[in-house]
Amino acid sequence: MADEIAKAQVARPGGDTIFGKIIRKEIPAKIIFEDDQCLAFHDISPQAPTHFLVIPKKHISQISAAEDADESLLGHLMIVGKKCAADLGLKKGYRMVVNEGSDGGQSVYHVHLHVLGGRQMNWPPG
C-alpha cells in the first residue's frame, strides 16, 4: 500500500497513461468485460482476493475534471462494476472506490473505479 501512496504523490495529470495502452490493446490485461464505453480488468496489484478496475474508454483524467455530459458514462462504470462483481461471485459484498488527486491516492490519471471483494473490508478505509 505504501508503494501506491508514493506513486500517487508523484503522479500528475496529462499525457498517455497505462490505461490508454490497455484500452488500445498495446499491453496485456486480464479483461473481464468490454463494451463501447468501458473496460473492466483485474488489478495488477490486488489489494483483496478479488480486485478489478472499471475504466471509461473516453479519457477523463480525474473525477474533478468530469463534465456534466459524462454523468451517464460515470454511472455506467458503476453498473458494469456491479455486474462484474456478480459474475465473479462476490455475493457477500464488495467495495467500490474512486481515488481523486494525490491526497486521495490517485496514481493513474485516467478515472478508474476499483472494485474489491472476497474478504471483509475494514472501516475506516483510509
UniProtKB/Swiss-Prot annotation:
Residues with the Phosphoserine modification: 45, 72
Domain HIT as annotated: residue spans: 18-126
Record keyword Aminoacyl-tRNA synthetase present: no
Keywords of the record: Acetylation, Apoptosis, Cytoplasm, Hydrolase, Nucleotide-binding, Nucleus, Phosphoprotein, Protease, Thiol protease, Transcription, Transcription regulation, Ubl conjugation pathway
GO cellular component labels: cytoplasm; histone deacetylase complex; nucleus
Catalytic-site annotation from UniProt: 112 (tele-amp-histidine intermediate)
UniProt-annotated binding residues for AMP: 43-44, 99, 105-107, 112-114
Effect recorded for residue 114 to D: Nearly abolishes its ability to convert adenosine 5'-O-phosphorothioate into 5'-O-monophosphate
Membrane-crossing segments per the record: none
Residue numbers bearing the N6-acetyllysine modification: 21, 30
Expression by tissue: Widely expressed.
A Gene Ontology BP annotation from the UniProt entry: regulation of DNA-templated transcription
Similarity section: Belongs to the HINT family.
Function: Exhibits adenosine 5'-monophosphoramidase activity, hydrolyzing purine nucleotide phosphoramidates with a single phosphate group such as adenosine 5'monophosphoramidate (AMP-NH2) to yield AMP and NH2. Hydrolyzes adenosine 5'monophosphomorpholidate (AMP-morpholidate) and guanosine 5'monophosphomorpholidate (GMP-morpholidate). Hydrolyzes lysyl-AMP (AMP-N-epsilon-(N-alpha-acetyl lysine methyl ester)) generated by lysine tRNA ligase. Hydrolyzes Met-AMP, His-AMP, Asp-AMP, lysyl-GMP (GMP-N-epsilon-(N-alpha-acetyl lysine methyl ester)) and AMP-N-alanine methyl ester.
Subunit structure: Homodimer. Interacts with CDK7. Interacts with RUVBL1 and RUVBL2 and is associated with the LEF1/TCF1-CTNNB1 complex and with a KAT5 histone acetyltransferase complex. Identified in a complex with MITF and CTNNB1. Interacts with CDC34 and RBX1, and is part of a SCF (SKP2-CUL1-F-box protein) E3 ubiquitin-protein ligase complex. Interacts with SUMO1, SUMO2 and RGS17. Interacts with the Ten-1 ICD form of TENM1. Interacts with CALM1; interaction increases in the presence of calcium ions.
Name the UniProt record assigns to this protein: Adenosine 5'-monophosphoramidase HINT1
Lineage of producing organism: Eukaryota, Metazoa, Chordata, Craniata, Vertebrata
